[in-house]
Amino acid sequence: MNVTILGAGVVGVTSAWYLAKAGHKVTVIDRQPAAALETSFANAGEVSPGYSSPWAAPGIPMKAMKWLFMKHAPLIIRPTADPAAWRWMSQMLRNCTSARYAINKSRMVRVAEYSRDCLMALREETGIDYDQRMQGTLEVFRTQKQFDAIGKDVDVLTAGGVPFEILDRDGCAAIEPGLAPAKEKIVGGLRLPGDETGDCFMFTTELARMAEEAGVTFLYDTGIMRPIVEGGRIKAVETTRGLIEADIFVAALGSYSPQFVRQLGLTLPVYPVKGYSITVPIVKEERAPVSTVMDETFKVAITRLGSRIRAGGMAEIAGFSKDLPAARQETLAHSVEDLFGGAGDQSQAKFWCGLRPMTPDGTPVIGATRYSNLYLNTGHGTLGWTMSCGSARVLADLISGNKPEIDTHDLAISRYAA
């Protein structure tokens, strides 16, 4: 079949790869001049199935109130008159119960664990290089209260068969020697040895090149305007290059997916949650992280990417704004310098932001819609890199009429109709 994918981020490009491998003729459309130039460009670099957790969690409403008064707050809510923002936040609050958290986290871990397996297989098949490291991730806790609260996560990890280690501060410093001078600032950590790290932009651009060699057509610098419906199906998509027809269409437009499907009468509860990153060159090897260290207090992930350190995180609900406030850069730099002082050259920091497409329950939306030839692959939030290969493989199986290797009944948009 002829399949047209809307969006050339990591989710769109991996979808193109697996669909092409399944024998379909694939076209990818994106408004940018190349792949991975928006949310996939400079994310935190984690491939972390075990840390796949919804932001909607017990205690978050109270924490959000406290964060309002923090200098380096991990969550910022900008005043907005956008009803979609308030509707999304209301739905998110309804997911902040222990019962909903357990359900949502189990869904997310299911997709993320499968995705890591798919990434491993793809790496073995292609030899793709993206500054990857397979040395696990470490979440560090600065307070005893944070450390004591990991029980609910440990329960889900245990139930899912995900290996983990609970470490004291000395154990954290043994895993990440660069933490040793700052170890008194933490009380302990949770390590997931099966997690990986890597540069999402490098991966996506290289996979796009491989996909093109495999016959995928990429139409860059092409604006996507509206779907054309005929007989209950999407006949074509109107673009700045004219009408593009296909047998199947896949919306992998990240935070812009709701705008596209709204024209079809579909309500997709995906909203942009802005995240930030800084990237600095390593100047002191002995102080640099080995892999990824997640700072629970500031919700910042500090990752080694080759000869660079990438610090990414925070969450800002500010619509589609892409401004870069100096205060956000200060927070990222503070987290890096506080734990890995002097490891990177902050004077050469490259500051970036991206709009993560978040669902209120944290789980991505993958699968069919009420239009027989329209599929969705979006809403991955902070985990687009982690979940991309698995989500794409699931999508390719669904479109090809094959049974996916994991349960997908609760991943489609239909779960919001209940």
Curated annotation (Swiss-Prot):
Purpose of the protein: Oxidative deamination of D-amino acids.
GO terms, biological process: D-alanine catabolic process
NCBIfam families, per the entry: PRK00711.1
Residues given in the record as FAD binding sites: 3-17
Name by which UniProt lists this protein: D-amino acid dehydrogenase
Family, similarity comment: Belongs to the DadA oxidoreductase family.
Organism: Agrobacterium fabrum (strain C58 / ATCC 33970) (Agrobacterium tumefaciens (strain C58))
The keyword Zinc is assigned to this record: no
Protein's pathway: Amino-acid degradation; D-alanine degradation; NH(3) and pyruvate from D-alanine: step 1/1
Gene: dadA
Lineage: Bacteria, Pseudomonadati, Pseudomonadota, Alphaproteobacteria, Hyphomicrobiales
EC number: 1.4.99.-
Domain of life assignment: Bacteria
GO MF terms held by the record: D-amino-acid dehydrogenase activity
InterPro entries: DadA, FAD-dep_OxRdtase, FAD/NAD-bd_sf
Chemical reaction(s) catalysed: a D-alpha-amino acid + A + H2O = a 2-oxocarboxylate + AH2 + NH4(+)
Keywords: FAD, Flavoprotein, Oxidoreductase
Enzyme class (EC, first level): oxidoreductase
HAMAP family: DadA (MF_01202)
Co-factor requirement: FAD
GO cellular component annotations of the record: cytoplasm; plasma membrane
Signal peptide interval: none
